[in-house]
Amino acid sequence: MKVVIVTSVASLLDASIQFQKTACRHHCNYLSMQVVKEIEEFGTINEKNLEFDTWKDVIQNDEIDALVFYRVKQISISTGVLYKSMMRNRTKPISMYFVRDCLAFDGDPPSFRMTSCNINAYNRSKIKDLIILMNMKTCNKKIIGEFIIDNFGSVDALLSIINSNVTWITSVINNSNGRGINIRVSNNKMLTITSFRRFVNKLKMYKTTKCASQLDNLCTEMNKMDIIDKK
């Protein structure tokens, strides 16, 4: 399957172009897709984008089987409307994949379906690397900040991952502190909470005061949980 990756940034809160490319490439590799072109846009995507030569070359090429986006929110109009606009200049159907959302759009009648998504494994690998870096005395704030941007796009994106993987992250933190992988952490709840708080408090250095409360909320929720360490 030949595909084109489409990345776009509409605000400072969006993941960086480079992060979107990395995630999309990883997804394409996981699904054995051949990337033949990459399109970078600034702003959301709508029918007007299709008027540019870059898009015309892709849309009118029936050898292209699919477009791979980072997420659905890149498109400011209905996905079905965008699809119909593209099909006016094609003889062969084209699919759209949305990596972060683990969704695919297969055309008319408009229908989304879930796809196999391995981005979580990618994120977990990078979080392990981040925890190692944060435990190294030789890594300064600049190095860690650049690592976060290069691998997660933004601190907001990283926080979203942390929020959905609290139990796993505490397990990794515990392991990095040398406590082993088969400890029932609920028996050492205060120690676990302290380790988690220390981790997110370090991340506060990379957040503005406006966004720091999100980290506090994570710690509050953590305090309410009974956690069993898992591999």
Swiss-Prot record:
One of its GO terms (cellular component) is host cell nucleolus. Its main location: host cell. Induction: Expressed in the early phase of the viral replicative cycle. It is found in: Host nucleus, Host nucleolus. The keyword Protease does not apply. Signal peptide: none annotated. Keywords: Early protein, Host nucleus. InterPro entries: Poxvirus_F16. Pfam families: Pox_F16. The keyword Lyase does not apply. Belongs to the orthopoxvirus OPG058 family. This is Protein OPG061. It comes from Vaccinia virus (strain Western Reserve). The lineage of its organism: Viruses, Varidnaviria, Bamfordvirae, Nucleocytoviricota, Pokkesviricetes.
